Amino acid sequence: MNSYFNSMKPIICLFLSGLVLLTACQSSKRTEGAVPNIDSLEQALAQLTDPLERIDLKRQIVDLTMEAATPEERCRIFEEFATLVEEEVGMLNQRESDYLEHYYEYRYDDDANPIEPHDSIKQKELGYIQRGLQFDEVGEGIVLLAPAPTLFAKYLSQLPTYYQEYWQLLRDSENIAPDACLVLTWRELGDLIVRYEAYAESNPEQKELFVRLSDNYQYLQMVYMTGTDNTPIANESGSLDPELKSEWQRFMKAYPNSLTTELIKEFLQRKNYSDLNAMQERLEEVQKTSNHPLLLASSFL
């Protein structure tokens, strides 16, 4: 019996080796087959002009390339997808500008009573929703098509935590003041600024991302300290808005080491807040000379 098994060993080994080789060859063929597939999809993408079709096809490409990529490559793949989506959604907003301008007319009568949108309107909107888009009411009667979180969620979950946090900061900073009217509360704006500062402190090695966050951070800080055209920080006599003053005091107490706290302390010493130009110039001066990582990053732009 032993001699029988001994005589079979070389055959079994050869058989197993053949299986391994066959499997490897099949795997190699599948891999080789995937590359032309992606190339053909990229070529097809270059020929497409319809924004929705381009988004759909780019998503197919991302699905094929994301899984085998390194974390850094995944970030690059995702950014390419997000950039394309942003461009195509911009085209859609132009194409649907007339519809978006009348968005509320389809939902309210002349007396501002809610009405049921026509079936054609429902079908139009459903078509966009099914493709991963949504209608954002950004304030001041402005409605825009935008990517729904679900469009990116699957891919974001495959990215490093530092990148997910960076992405969320960008999203939360979008359209905070449509038509120069702040849609966040002063406290919400202050907390968003703190998140930017905390991100820089927690991820000191992400200097490339700091460069991308720098403009947003400066803008948020400017709005928080000097307001906007339609959300002023003071009344006509130059007296600081009581709600904002209370928020500044809360901010100072909660975040004593923040750069923004230094600005608040200086601004609270003012007797009058009518000269916004002087305040904005002072803030710009501080931002240009500060060694805060998010402000230093702006020098590399």
Where are the regions a protein language model picked out?
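Sec-dependent signal peptide recognition
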Residues: 9-16
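N-terminal secretory signal peptides that target proteins for export/translocation
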Residues: 1-8
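N-terminal Sec/ER secretory leader and immediately downstream segment
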Residues: 33-145
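A cross-kingdom marker for long, charged
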Residues: 222-226, 234-301
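C-terminal motif of bacterial Sec signal peptides marking the signal peptidase cleavage site
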Residues: 22-24
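Short coil/linker segments at helix-helix boundaries
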Residues: 106-124, 139, 146-148, 156-190, ...
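Short solvent-exposed coil/turn linkers within tandem alpha-helical repeat scaffolds
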Residues: 150-158, 199-211, 251-262
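Bacterial signal peptide processing site
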Residues: 26-29
